Amino acid sequence: MRVRLIAVGNKMPKWVTEGYDEYAKRLPKDFALELVEIPMSPRGKNTDIPKAIRKEGDSMLEAIPSGDKVIAMEVLGKEWSTDQLADQTEQWRMDGYNVSLLVGGPDGLDPRCTARADQTWSLSRLTLPHPMVRVILAEQIYRAWTLMNNHPYHR
């Protein structure tokens, strides 16, 4: 199984890259976590934000492999517990699906990405910085894998 994290932004602070990499490298090759970085459209005081979001959305939609289950990360999505994430992930694995998780930039996801998603998931009702979401998702994917494999990380 492969979980592809498709996220807007490609110039992350060192702590984000290190945090993400720490959890991604812990996963076995048969349960790979792959990061696909979508360049963020330039932002300035005269930026047409909807146009920038559409451009990012175009790139995100192109990055989704056919056949993947698609999960859009949205503040108003469904909140899952870690156990629910592990159960859902195990079901996807048993059904032979790979998964693409979509994380928007500072102005959110293109509505077409949300429409393309099979499910929407929320980490919190709080608005989280999009770089931090990468680290949290990587840790939660790793934690779900440990639950599925009776690993002592999740107690």
UniProtKB/Swiss-Prot annotation:
GO cellular component, as recorded: cytoplasm
Q: What residue stretch is flagged as signal peptide?
A: none
The yes or no answer to whether the keyword Membrane is present is: no
Positions with a binding annotation for S-adenosyl-L-methionine:
104, 123-128
One GO term in the molecular function aspect is: rRNA (pseudouridine-N3-)-methyltransferase activity
- What SUPFAM superfamilies does the entry give? alpha/beta knot
Q: Which protein, by its recorded name, is this?
A: Ribosomal RNA large subunit methyltransferase H
Which organism's genome codes for this protein? Marinomonas sp. (strain MWYL1)
Question: What gene is it encoded by?
Answer: rlmH
